Amino acid sequence: MNIIDLRSDTFTQPTDAMREAMAGAEVGDDVFEEDPSVKKLEQLAANKMGKEAALFVPSGTMGNLVSVLTQCNRGDEVLLGDQSHIFLNEVGGIAALGGIHPRTLPNQKDGTLDLDALDKAVRSKNLHCPPTRLICLENTHNYCQGTPLTPAYMENVAKLAARHSLKIHLDGARIFNAAIALKTDGRELAQE
């Protein structure tokens, strides 16, 4: 009997064909950027997302951590949803490893953050508070029933971020799910 476990996409298992492909893959030294499989995967990801380059990391948690640490300094603040994966399921990595202050706002049922609340939450000039540097979003939003963030919403957040000279990080672990649900592609959902 085949059992389908729908608790999380993390329960997926590779097929026999996938295992064979991994076992037969050409490998090289990753330190010297000589692993052709990784280079090909990174180029494929960059092309699918319309980006100049991509970086392979072994987990979504590491991808989020690298991205947030790249865009913030110790003592900076990140605004993110109270139901976001980064806040709930990534062992406080941005605070523990980066000294970055996570400040949560309530996620709406559709995974969005209220734009007025987000606008009011931005801090930059008060020397008693950590300066806000980054807004983190998640698409699709895992704890909000897998709802996708629309390009229109993302554009509104981008305009808000630009007004405050903030950066945006998109946790896109399920971005292709969002693209399918919205009948678009990853490029549109990851525009700068």
Task: Describe the residue ranges of each PLM region.
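Conserved PLP-enzyme active-site core in the AAT-like
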Residues: 1-192
